[in-house]
């Protein structure tokens, strides 16, 4: 099962450097805190619509593979993050199987809990980078995050209803 927003997310093309953009746009794209929290600050009720979740092999993550350790399996989670029921963001998280140990096993059990609610309560969360991407007029971003030093890759596409636009 897929969704057109996830297809467009995978089509994002990333800038080699952070482009010169309007400050309001950069404020959204370079946000280091939780996007869930930012959406809630807009006075919205945030919910997750699950598109896909489960283990995948390398051939299903060609865009992410160069940015993660080479392993036999990865945990993939694809969602729509909705504000008052309206999709504002498509998200794709790829987690190497080696990251799924200790407390990080919880990444497999998030269900309809927004990823940000888990990640940004962890004292061990660090971010290696944020890349800005664009496709067909929509903006997105990709971050390699680490929990207790263990990597995961999060890609987000801001959908047309998002306040980023």
Curated annotation (Swiss-Prot):
Q: Does the keyword Lyase apply?
A: yes
**Coiled coil region boundaries:** none
Amino acids binding substrate: 35, 77, 115, 156
Q: Name one Pfam family in it.
A: Chor_lyase
Arranged from A to Z, the UniProt key words for this protein are: Cytoplasm, Lyase, Pyruvate, Ubiquinone biosynthesis
What EC number(s) would the UniProt record show? 4.1.3.40
Keyword Cytoplasm appears in the UniProt entry:
yes
| BP-aspect Gene Ontology terms | pyruvate biosynthetic process; ubiquinone biosynthetic process
Q: What does this protein do?
A: Removes the pyruvyl group from chorismate, with concomitant aromatization of the ring, to provide 4-hydroxybenzoate (4HB) for the ubiquinone pathway.
Q: What do we know about how this protein assembles, alone or with others?
A: Monomer.
Q: What is this protein called?
A: Chorismate pyruvate-lyase
Annotated organism of origin: Escherichia coli (strain 55989 / EAEC)
